[in-house]
């Protein structure tokens, strides 16, 4: 949300621009990571789903146990519980009949203030979860007691390369070890009993802006890991390492490299034919595998989701057109060798950041009277796809949110029919969905009881325009998109725009390709999903509420206030005969950092927490007593309209990805610059150009901001803060408190008694 005094009709009614969909974030303050206590974890017996008595084995997981996961439903042994990534729990003790008695049984405050996106793993009574900056925690899954923690000590300066917050989506467990990818590109194997390092591999080139936020998958003894960084100009790939010793087994690049060099394999030689120009490889090409994977043991096939191009703008990336394989594609590989099997491209010649890295689900279902083995995905581009996972053959696709970039998917070719209104090379175009997508990384779920897929949907629009001054810079993001687009210029337009920023939970019939029911949410960027045999769908919401809905009708049947926005997906497990529902809560990610949308008032806490619920749980969260700070008086800085315009351009191109569009940060982990103290104002240039806060993650921007630019940037931030103050003194704040109240205040701290579950301590 941008209070923009330059394009406003008056200085009082400043422009409020919602830069919805910018998927870039990463610099800012560091978290205070929890104690690396490395206390020995109590080993749990193999039937820990029903017995928490310690034995000599810890995390004794292998492929056969995961394949046979339904025989021990009390464990959550893999990222999606099973290799098919359905995220469905066969446990039914907690059901639509008993959920009224569901209560909190323990919680543990993480002490972190950045986004938390992890799916915990629970094996034989021990929960393994991850936090921001790639920290790993092991807890007693029954009591929440911290058993050990591991901090990879990622240099905070590397956070500037994390497009979408310094998040981590989880660990993997295999034969007594815990595996995690770190934000600076390492793959680390830990001893599951105490968190000590067994081996570590640097999976990326440290001279390029690679990151890892996705969870590893372990298949046939290989740890599979991808990476991110397409916004910064990298070449995507996925790599397999031996789980035993960390030796590299194979690597599959998703886009071709330098055409003067030999192609790594036949698949890349074919892919190169779909690219145009002779310099695409110099900007990396993109195609990072930053999140979703799935595995079919019967077919021995690994499925990877491939991301966007670098830059986003295809007219710059590949002048002359082309599909640009394997961008925005589902690619099937042999997990033992990395050999290409087939691909299906959801968005040929991607031009809008429409990744295919979103959650993929494998299922067997009857379609058109025939039994089909399918892979399903709701990628960013707004269409829900059903693909034959044996051959890659297109089966069907329909829009699950409003779509403007294409009219439909051709049923004969499986390719989209693009709308002429989606091309922004010469004109500004407002397109839905925007770069955040109709659905982002937040996992879906499939229930075999209802045969429905449940989607945490977005569908926000975005204004696309070509950056005609684009020049590749390896130290910053390279999109080919013009960020300096005027937004709504009056309070009425501001309110109208904010009212569109919502999300919903959709139940989708993948055979009929139609929506069955919908739950509309008041806010956007809501959490991932869990379905259970108890006819329930669990979802955390951006408003700081954890909720359950009936899977067949979508009726809300249970809620619990958590006081911090939830974006991660829940899981379910059983210990000593009791079923638990657990979720990691912590606001952040791309939307939380970048969108500039005021956070929901109920999403008031800065710090994250892990929570576990069971029938009869009696624990009560302390009611947060938040101290709210009004916008402070600003220093007197003189600047011309030209200087303010330059400051705005510098902010939009370099700062809003961390500090929020319109200088509004809705997450607690990165400062909202409108609230700077007098001392920070005095130190402005030392921070921006001198790198005074590098150890906090705020690196020097002297490579793109000169001395005068620093002054212009400072003046712009102050002018926006003053315009914010003016707007907040109008009746609009009173009339639309749900939209504007938290645009005018920020939470300083929870002034209640520190919870016993605070980082490094015990759980409650």
Language model features with spans:
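Short, conserved, GDST-rich strand-edge loop motifs in beta-rich repeat architectures
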Residues: 225-237, 277, 304-324, 428, ...
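Bacterial signal peptide processing site
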Residues: 27-30
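Blade/loop signatures of beta-propeller domains
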Residues: 48-104, 258-269, 416-419, 494-495, ...
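Repeat-blade elements of multi-bladed beta-propeller folds
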Residues: 76-80, 115-135, 160-186, 211-232, ...
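Flexible coil segments in periplasmic/lumen-exposed cytochrome c-class electron-transfer proteins
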Residues: 625-645, 649-654, 661, 696-764
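Gly/Gly-Pro-rich "capping" loops immediately C-terminal to redox-active cysteine motifs
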Residues: 660-693, 699-700
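Extracytoplasmic beta-rich repeat domains
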Residues: 108-119, 149-172, 200-215, 253-292, ...
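Detector for the c-type heme attachment site
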Residues: 81, 389, 658-665, 689-690, ...
């Amino acid at each position: 949300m941008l209070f923009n005094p330059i394009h406003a009709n008056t200085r009082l009614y400043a422009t409020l621009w919602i830069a919805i969909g910018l998927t870039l974030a990463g610099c800012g303050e560091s978290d205070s990571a929890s104690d690396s206590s490395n206390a020995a974890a109590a080993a749990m017996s193999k039937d820990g789903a029903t017995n928490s008595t310690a034995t000599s084995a810890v995390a004794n997981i292998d492929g056969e146990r995961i394949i046979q996961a339904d025989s021990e439903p009390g464990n959550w042994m893999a990222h999606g519980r099973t290799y098919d990534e359905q995220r469905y729990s066969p446990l039914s003790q907690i059901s639509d009949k008993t959920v009224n008695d569901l209560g909190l049984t323990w919680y543990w405050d993480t002490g972190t203030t950045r986004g938390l996106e992890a799916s915990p793993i629970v094996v034989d009574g021990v929960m393994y979860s991850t936090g921001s900056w790639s920290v790993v925690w092991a807890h007693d899954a029954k009591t929440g007691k911290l058993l050990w923690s591991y901090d990879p000590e990622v240099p905070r300066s590397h956070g500037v390369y994390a497009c979408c917050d310094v998040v981590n989506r989880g660990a993997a467990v295999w034969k007594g070890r815990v595996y995690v990818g770190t934000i600076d590109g390492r793959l680390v194997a830990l001893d599951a009993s105490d968190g000590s390092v067994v081996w570590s591999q640097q999976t990326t080139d440290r001279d390029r802006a690679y990151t890892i936020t996705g969870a590893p998958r372990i298949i046939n003894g290989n740890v599979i890991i991808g990476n991110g960084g397409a916004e910064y100009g990298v070449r995507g790939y996925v790599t397999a390492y031996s789980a035993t010793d960390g030796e590299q087994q194979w690597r599959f690049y998703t886009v071709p490299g330098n055409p003067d060099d030999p192609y790594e394999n036949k698949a890349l030689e074919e892919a190169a034919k779909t690219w145009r120009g002779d310099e695409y490889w110099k900007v990396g090409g993109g195609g990072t595998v930053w999140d979703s994977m799935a595995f079919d043991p019967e077919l021995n096939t690994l499925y990877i989701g491939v991301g966007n191009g670098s830059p986003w703008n295809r007219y710059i990336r590949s002048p002359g057109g082309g599909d640009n394989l394997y961008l925005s594609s589902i690619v099937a590989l042999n997990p033992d060798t990395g050999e290409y099997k087939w691909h299906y491209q959801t968005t040929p010649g991607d031009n809008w950041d429409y990744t295919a890295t979103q959650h993929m689900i494998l299922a067997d279902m009857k379609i058109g009277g025939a039994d089909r083995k399918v892979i399903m995905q709701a990628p960013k581009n707004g269409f829900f796809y059903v693909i034959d996972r044996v051959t890659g053959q297109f089966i069907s696709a329909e829009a699950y949110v409003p779509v403007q970039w294409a009219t439909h998917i051709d049923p004969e070719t499986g390719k989209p029919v693009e709308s002429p209104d989606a091309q922004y090379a010469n004109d500004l175009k407002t397109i839905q969905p925007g770069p955040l997508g109709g659905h982002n990384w937040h996992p879906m779920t499939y229930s075999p009881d209802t045969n429905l897929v449940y989607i945490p949907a977005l569908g926000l629009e975005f204004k696309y325009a070509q950056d005609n001054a684009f020049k590749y810079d390896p130290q910053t993001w390279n999109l080919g998109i013009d960020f300096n687009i005027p937004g709504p210029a009056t309070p009425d337009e501001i309110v109208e725009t904010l009212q569109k920023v919502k999300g919903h939970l959709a139940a989708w019939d993948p055979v009929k390709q139609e929506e069955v029911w919908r739950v509309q949410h008041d806010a956007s960027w809501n959490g991932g999903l869990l379905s259970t045999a108890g006819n329930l769908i669990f979802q955390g919401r951006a408003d700081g509420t954890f909720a359950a809905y009936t899977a067949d009708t979508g009726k809300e049947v249970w809620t619990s206030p958590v006081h911090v926005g939830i974006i991660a997906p829940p899981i379910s497990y059983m210990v000593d005969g009791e079923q638990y529902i657990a979720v990691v809560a912590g606001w952040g990610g791309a939307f939380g950092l970048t969108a500039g949308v005021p956070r929901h008032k109920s999403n008031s806490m800065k710090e994250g927490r892990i929570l576990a619920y069971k029938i009869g749980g009696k624990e009560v969260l302390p009611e947060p007593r938040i101290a709210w700070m009004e916008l402070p008086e600003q220093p007197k800085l003189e600047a011309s309209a030209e200087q303010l315009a330059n400051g705005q351009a510098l902010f939009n191109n370099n700062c809003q990805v961390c500090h929020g569009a319109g200088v509004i940060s809705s997450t607690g982990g990165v400062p909202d610059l409108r609230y700077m103290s007098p001392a920070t104002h005095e130190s402005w240039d030392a921070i921006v150009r001198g790198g005074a806060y590098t150890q906090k993650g705020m690196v020097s921007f002297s490579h793109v901001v000169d001395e005068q630019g620093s002054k212009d940037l400072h003046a712009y931030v102050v002018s926006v803060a003053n315009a914010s103050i003016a707007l907040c003194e109008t009746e609009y704040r009173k009339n639309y408190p749900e939209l504007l109240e938290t645009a005018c205040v920020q939470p300083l701290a929870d002034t209640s008694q520190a919870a016993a579950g605070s980082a490094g301590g015990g759980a409650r």
